[in-house]
Amino acid sequence: MGSMTIREKRKMLEKMKALAKEKDICVLATVSGGNPYCSLMAYATDDDCREIYMVTNKETRKYRNLIENPSVSLLIDTREEHVGSKRPQAKALTVTGLFQIIDKESKKALVRAKLLEKHPHLAEFLDQADAELFCIKVTSFLLLNGLTEAHFEAV
């Protein structure tokens, strides 16, 4: 595909953000000691999709990996809507970013509310002493549209 105009790039970035906001489950990829580790995670985003919010237990490998190496990758996709012969039309959005603990109480309340809005089943988990709210500060989006059409946007 040829180069895109600024307007087309902006429109594509908005499509990527819309997909991230529409979905609520992702695969979080972390690395520790050169070994990759994937976790299925519930998430919510801020309004502009610059931050992706999650919660985890502090006593997990995932959390230790995040502390050791804050660079992460997320996979958000449409495979559930594209089954059988529609599989080639599936979209896969790879989000890269940096892990950051949320420590301000005012922000914790906001993030908690956003997570509960999308995931009411997390209420009990969020109340546990070892539950840690965190965000991924988005650095880029890579959208694979079908099998061959790819779009990358740094943010």
What are these regions (language model features)?
Residues 1-26:
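Extreme N-terminal tail/first-helix region
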Residues 2-8, 87-155:
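Charged, gly/pro-rich active-site loop segments
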Residues 15, 27-28, 82-84, 120-128:
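Short helix-to-loop capping/linker segments positioned immediately adjacent to catalytic or ligand/cofactor-binding
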Residues 20-21, 67, 116:
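Alpha-helix boundary recognition
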Residues 23-58, 64-66, 73-76, 85-87:
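Short beta-strand segments
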Residues 29, 44, 55, 75-77, ...:
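Residues in well-ordered beta-strands of folded domains
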Residues 56-60, 75-81, 112-122:
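Short acidic (Asp/Glu) patches
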Residues 68-70, 120:
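Proline-centered flexible-loop/turn and helix-kink motifs
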